[in-house]
Regions:
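Hydrophobic transmembrane alpha-helices
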Residues: 1-21
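Membrane-embedded alpha-helical hairpins and interfacial helices in multi-pass inner-membrane proteins
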Residues: 4, 24-138
Length: 138
């Protein structure tokens, strides 16, 4: 669910910092509670992937297809698939290119659902609801 928030930079530039900080804190808490088995690797590379994806998402915010920022939903899918897929392949194996593709594919599927099935409707609802839109003014 939280991955749907990776599209919030479409609405306001400050969301780049927000989603990046949220990712960092979640990864940090996950390490300390034992929930994040990738550990420091994910704190550094996962957060960097989120920042990169958020910046790209912001850059593509005005590219629309039938009013939806479809292009802006692509960077979180691709960047997280590559980075988190590599983390998972390194940590759990198999440490082969095929292993990486398998891990990256799994991450991409989850990201596709989060960004396209949840994130795009979330952006649409915020943009169409005056009370919500007021929270996301530039």
């Amino acid at each position: 669910m939280s991955e749907a928030f990776t599209l919030l930079p479409v609405l306001v530039p400050d969301a780049v910092v927000g989603v990046t900080l949220g990712c960092f804190l979640t990864n940090l808490v996950g390490v300390f509670t034992g929930a994040n088995v990738l550990g420091a690797l994910d704190i550094v590379f996962g957060t960097a992937a989120t920042l990169t994806a958020a910046l790209c998402t912001r850059r593509l915010a005005r590219v629309r297809l039938r009013g939806l920022p479809v292009a802006a939903a692509v960077p979180p899918v691709l960047i997280n698939a590559v980075v988190v897929g590599a983390e998972l392949a390194w940590a759990f194996g198999p440490r082969t290119f095929a292993g990486f593709l398998l891990q990256a594919g799994g991450v991409a599927l989850g990201q596709l659902f989060s960004c396209f099935a949840l994130g795009l409707p979330l952006v649409r609802i915020i943009e169409k609801t005056p009370a919500l839109r007021a929270w996301f003014r530039d």
